[in-house]
């Protein structure tokens, strides 16, 4: 099954997440099908906190991809900011 979820990158105590489309059987930070955005929880000042390609999200959800809980909240936030 294909899922849209977060893959952790960054350094120790400084998380940075890629929002990826991946097979649910693959490891969290393992192989992915497509990178569709990023999330920086520690963004300060003018740094971008969230970037997400909503067209690609809709494409993958239309094909039957499931969305993780945290990613669903981020998609909702990105859609609100885009409107």
Swiss-Prot record:
The keyword Cytoplasm does not apply. One of its GO terms (biological process) is translation. It holds the Pfam family Ribosomal_S16. It comes from the Bacteria. Transmembrane segments: none annotated. One of its GO terms (cellular component) is small ribosomal subunit. Signal peptide: none annotated. One of its GO terms (molecular function) is structural constituent of ribosome. Keywords: Ribonucleoprotein, Ribosomal protein. InterPro entries: Ribosomal_bS16 (IPR000307), Ribosomal_bS16_CS (IPR020592), Ribosomal_bS16_dom_sf (IPR023803). Belongs to the bacterial ribosomal protein bS16 family. This is Small ribosomal subunit protein bS16. It comes from Photobacterium profundum (strain SS9).
């Amino acid at each position: 099954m294909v899922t849209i979820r977060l893959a952790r990158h960054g350094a120790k105590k400084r998380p940075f997440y890629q929002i990826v489309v991946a097979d649910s059987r693959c490891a969290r930070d393992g192989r992915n099908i497509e990178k569709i955005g990023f999330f920086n929880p520690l963004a300060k000042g003018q740094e971008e906190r969230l970037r997400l390609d909503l067209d690609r999200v809709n494409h993958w959800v239309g094909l039957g991809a499931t969305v993780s809980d945290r990613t669903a909240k981020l998609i909702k936030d990105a859609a609100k900011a885009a409107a």
